């Protein structure tokens, strides 16, 4: 068994304008918030308690996720008044957890289908202090890379370089032994990636890399968020319960449509993400656009690469 912490406090700067009115972990991907996809993965791995480490727009999480009973687990909330970095957020959230089980840390803007249960088992079999999920990418120059020895033990954390020594990169899911979290200073800005992990390796502590080449995507930009939604849908479109679609509406490109929406006659939608409770009137044409929760799109509206809400109409850089 294990417990978990979801790091969902970021400002989502790279995702603007989609994050003007919503924190990035609450943006819909294939009809569900990014965080809900992670909660489902955590549940599958046997994680019974999760702490959402929140900051920006923290008030939107509790009404949606509640106490976690909908997912058969316990969900708690730790709110940062000021951002504390990944390490500070982990240390703050861990105050709500016990110290007798591994702690799985989820990066708030990653979609992954790797086996968290296998990562936990690998961590325990190696008596590791920390075990990172690593993936191999074709071109590691845009990432910091993480070389390991033949046993999977991490030997260094290297910044971006023109000639990487390995294609293995940090995929953003960590398993901590609880006593290691207690070593992170409380109430202090700390980056586990830049400070904690390199320090552990330099001290000769057991830090391991768990490699699994399953589906993985950082959805931290608008283009990546749209891609992630398309990847999960694997078809022309997906509509959540309660949505009605006119018989002659044309919906393609892996479009995601939220719950209780109304799609009018003659509407053309291609490669869009549409929130819950949206009304799109007849003849509207929407391409590569994000239509926020509760938006009313008038008839014959034409939008391409646009963030549209009740209050905003902004271009999206895709």
Question: Residues of each region from the PLM?
Answer:
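A structural signal for short hydrophobic beta-strand segments in well-ordered beta-sheet cores
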Residues: 26, 146-148, 197, 209
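Short internal beta-strands
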Residues: 51-55, 133-134, 290
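Mobile, glycine- and charge-enriched loop segments
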Residues: 1-28
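Conserved N-terminal catalytic core of the sugar/cofactor nucleotidyltransferase
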Residues: 2-6, 28, 32-107, 116-118, ...
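Active-site metal-binding loops of divalent metal-dependent hydrolases
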Residues: 11, 108-110
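A structural motif detector for beta-strand N-caps
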Residues: 237-250, 255, 261-263, 267, ...
């Amino acid at each position: 068994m294990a417990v978990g912490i979801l790091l969902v406090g970021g400002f989502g700067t790279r995702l603007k304008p989609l994050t003007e009115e919503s924190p990035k972990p609450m943006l819909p991907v294939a009809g569900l918030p990014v965080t809900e996809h992670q909660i489902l993965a955590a549940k599958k791995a046997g994680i019974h308690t999760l702490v959402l480490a929140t900051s920006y727009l923290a008030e939107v999480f509790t009404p949606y996720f509640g106490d976690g009973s909908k997912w058969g687990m316990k969900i708690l909330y730790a709110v940062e008044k000021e951002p504390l970095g990944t390490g500070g957020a982990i240390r703050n959230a861990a105050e709500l957890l016990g110290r007798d089980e591994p702690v799985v840390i989820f990066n708030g803007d990653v979609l992954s289908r790797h086996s968290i249960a296998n990562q936990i088992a690998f961590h325990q079999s190696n008596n590791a202090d920390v075990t990172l999920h690593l993936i191999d990418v074709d071109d590691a120059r845009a990432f910091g890379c993480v070389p390991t020895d033949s046993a999977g033990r991490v030997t260094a954390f290297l910044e971006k370089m023109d000639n990487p020594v390995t294609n293995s990169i940090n995929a953003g899911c960590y398993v901590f032994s609880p006593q290691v979290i207690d070593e992170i200073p409380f109430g202090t800005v700390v980056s586990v990636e830049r400070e904690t992990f390199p320090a552990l390796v330099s001290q000769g502590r057991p830090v391991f890399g768990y490699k699994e080449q399953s589906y993985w995507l950082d959805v931290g930009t608008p283009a990546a968020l749209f891609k992630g939604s398309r990847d999960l849908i694997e078809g022309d479109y997906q509509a959540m319960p309660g949505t009605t679609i006119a018989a002659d509406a044309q919906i393609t490109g892996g479009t995601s449509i939220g719950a209780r929406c109304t799609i009018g006659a003659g509407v053309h939608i291609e490669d869009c993400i549409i929130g819950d409770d949206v009304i799109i009137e007849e003849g509207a044409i929407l391409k590569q656009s994000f239509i926020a929760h509760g938006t009313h799109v008038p008839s014959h509206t034409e939008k391409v690469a646009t963030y549209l809400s009740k209050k905003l109409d902004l271009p999206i850089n895709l």
